[in-house]
Regions:
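ABC family nucleotide-binding domain
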Residues: 10-167
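Short, Lys/Arg-enriched N-terminal segments with co-localized hydrophobic residues
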Residues: 1-7
């Protein structure tokens, strides 16, 4: 029975993108530039996917849209079978339960390492937020840096903080 439960859970669609289009106003103020056009994607729980393409083709834009930082012009994005982005729906990033490690790490310079990791856990009580952040700080072997600020860390350490925050 346990194998069947695992099999059913792993086949569950975690992310579904249907005919996604994302556009930006053109720099000259006339018309729009299409960043993503007609993207379809289904990713099951436990499955690993990869976006490949040349520089500027829209990979980061798609990831930002999944996280909620970019709106869908047309099409829709579903997380766990719930529409989180479409022309008429936009669930804010903090309500999507999606983490992302940015190319530049995007750490808040005025927050300590522990505060950076806890930032996305605002819906938890303070003690649970701190405990969860400390758990992930331990997992990335930076528990001794909890009170440090991002500028006091190496690039590799900053990346591990960003990874802990995404988790």
């Amino acid at each position: 029975i346990n194998e069947k439960i695992i099999e059913m859970n792993s086949a569950r669609t975690l992310l579904s993108i249907k005919q996604l289009e994302i556009v930006y106003p053109s720099q000259n103020g006339h018309g729009y530039n299409t960043a993503v056009n007609g993207l379809n994607l289904d990713l099951a729980q436990g499955e690993i996917g990869c976006l490949l393409g040349s520089s500027g083709c829209g990979k980061s834009t798609v990831l930002r849209a999944i996280c909620g930082f970019e709106p869908a012009h047309t099409g829709e994005i579903l997380l766990r079978d719930k529409v989180v982005s479409s022309a008429s729906v936009h669930i804010p990033p903090n309500q999507r339960r999606v983490g992302m490690v940015f190319q530049d790490f995007a750490l808040f310079p005025h927050l300590t390492v522990l505060e950076n990791i806890a930032f996305g856990l605002q819906d938890l009580p303070s003690d649970k937020r701190t405990a969860s952040a400390q758990h992930w700080l331990d997992r990335v072997s930076l528990s001794d840096k909890a009170d440090a600020y991002p500028h006091e860390l190496s690039g590799g350490q900053q990346q591990r903080v960003a990874l802990a925050r995404a988790m």
